[in-house]
């Protein structure tokens, strides 16, 4: 018979409930699922033990649901023996940067749509981003409106988006680094 796992509490050493052990195993399996969804280059950056890396790569190849479920349980079992905190922290950093990137992308799309639809939006954009070349933006807005009215592909709209991205990513004027 296997000895029960125990946990130190303020009342001494108590056995860990089966429910808690199952919840911990499920959490490790969820991390394993996340690992299987990562591209290989990110997996290699995580510095995983070789057995775990092999198991994750094997899970990526498996197509059978039953076999994949067993492989995920195996990955969860391997993860019980390692410290998962650094892995979870790195995954959260990657997820945070991805979320920030999506939010920035949506803000740029909103600016582009407002500029195309609303005449007064350009002055707001210029006041927020003073390093904007207004004439270039006006030309792209005008062309995007024409293309939309004619039912043509949104070439100027894409160019406007690229220009807005370069403007918003550029440092504000007066904050340029000096090369000493």
Swiss-Prot record:
Region named Disordered: 1-21
Residue spans of biased composition, Basic and acidic residues class: 1-13
InterPro entries, per the entry: DarP, DarP_sf
A Pfam family that the UniProt record links to this protein: DarP
Primary location group: cytoplasm
GO molecular function: ribosome binding; rRNA binding
Keywords for this protein: Cytoplasm, Ribosome biogenesis, RNA-binding, rRNA-binding
Domain of life: Bacteria
GO process annotations (BP): assembly of large subunit precursor of preribosome
Function: Member of a network of 50S ribosomal subunit biogenesis factors which assembles along the 30S-50S interface, preventing incorrect 23S rRNA structures from forming. Promotes peptidyl transferase center (PTC) maturation.
Family affiliation: Belongs to the DarP family.
Name by which UniProt lists this protein: Dual-action ribosomal maturation protein DarP
Gene giving rise to this polypeptide: darP
């Amino acid at each position: 018979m296997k000895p029960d796992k125990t946990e130190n509490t303020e009342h001494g050493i108590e056995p860990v409930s089966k429910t808690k052990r199952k919840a911990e195993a499920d959490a490790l399996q969820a991390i394993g699922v996340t690992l299987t969804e990562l591209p290989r280059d990110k997996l290699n950056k995580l510095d995983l033990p070789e057995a775990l890396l092999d198991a994750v790569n094997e899970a990526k190849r498996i197509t059978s649901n039953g076999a994949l479920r067993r492989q995920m349980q195996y990955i969860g079992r391997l993860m019980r023996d390692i410290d998962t905190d650094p892995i979870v922290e790195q995954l959260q950093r990657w997820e945070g940067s991805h979320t920030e990137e999506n939010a920035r992308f949506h803000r740029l799309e909103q600016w582009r749509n407002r500029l195309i639809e609303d005449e007064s939006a350009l002055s707001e954009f210029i006041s927020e981003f003073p390093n904007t070349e207004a004439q270039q933006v006006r030309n792209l807005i005008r062309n995007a409106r024409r293309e939309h009215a004619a039912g043509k592909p949104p070439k100027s709209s894409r160019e406007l988006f690229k220009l807005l991205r370069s403007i918003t990513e550029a440092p504000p004027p007066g904050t340029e680094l000096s090369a000493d």
